[in-house]
């Protein structure tokens, strides 16, 4: 099963594509889609959409897993991240992909087995599980790979996390 994991963001959207078969992970690609703050928001969203469209076309993932937004005290930031998340969901939906969402707590539990794990613990587990030589940077990329791993580990419970 090919899984595209997404950590949404307007300035930096992390993505990671893994193949999960027989309890084994293989990394196909990972990276970040970045947009400068000097660019108008609609143009930034178009850039994210185009890049995700290209990635989905190239790798044809079976499913897309995206991190849910957590409550942010900065309303403007939360709205902008929400816009980027919406564009990511739209891109996947336009390719008729099943889309699943996970909270940060669920991602931590799915990757490390502990919901209060810190960022460095998650990053080290991503590195270990995916047999990488170093932790992917920026952090958003490691987070996206963690979302994909979480989805793979969810197994038969995926229907609970499907966006309907």
From Swiss-Prot:
One of its GO terms (molecular function) is crossover junction DNA endonuclease activity. Its EC number is 3.1.21.10. GO terms for cellular component: cytoplasm; Holliday junction resolvase complex. The keyword Kinase does not apply. Mg(2+) 1 binds at residues 7, 140. Mg(2+) 2 binds at residue 67. It comes from the Bacteria. GO terms for biological process: DNA recombination; DNA repair. Keywords: Cytoplasm, DNA damage, DNA recombination, DNA repair, DNA-binding, Endonuclease, Hydrolase, Magnesium, Metal-binding, Nuclease. CDD domains: RuvC (cd16962). This is Crossover junction endodeoxyribonuclease RuvC. PROSITE patterns: RUVC. Its cofactor is Mg(2+). Belongs to the RuvC family. InterPro entries: RNaseH-like_sf, RNaseH_sf, X-over_junc_endoDNase_Mg_BS, X-over_junc_endoDNase_RuvC. It is found in: Cytoplasm. It comes from Alkaliphilus oremlandii (strain OhILAs). It is an enzyme of class 3 (hydrolase). The active site is at 7, 67, 140. The keyword Magnesium applies.
């Amino acid at each position: 099963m090919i899984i595209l994991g997404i950590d949404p963001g307007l300035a930096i959207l992390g993505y990671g594509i893994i193949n999960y078969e027989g309890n084994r992970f293989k990394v196909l690609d990972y990276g970040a889609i970045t947009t400068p703050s000097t660019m108008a928001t609609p143009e930034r969203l178009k850039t994210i959409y185009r890049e995700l469209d290209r990635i989905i076309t190239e790798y044809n993932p079976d499913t897309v897993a995206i991190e849910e937004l957590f409550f942010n005290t900065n309303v403007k930031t939360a709205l902008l991240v929400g816009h980027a998340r919406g564009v990511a969901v739209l891109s996947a939906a336009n390719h008729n992909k099943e889309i699943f969402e996970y909270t940060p707590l669920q991602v931590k539990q799915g990757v490390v087995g502990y919901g209060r794990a810190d960022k460095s613990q998650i990053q080290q587990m991503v590195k270990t599980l995916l047999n990488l030589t170093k932790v992917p940077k920026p952090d958003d990329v490691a987070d996206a790979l963690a979302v994909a791993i979480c989805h793979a580990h969810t197994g038969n419970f995926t229907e609970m996390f499907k966006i309907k």
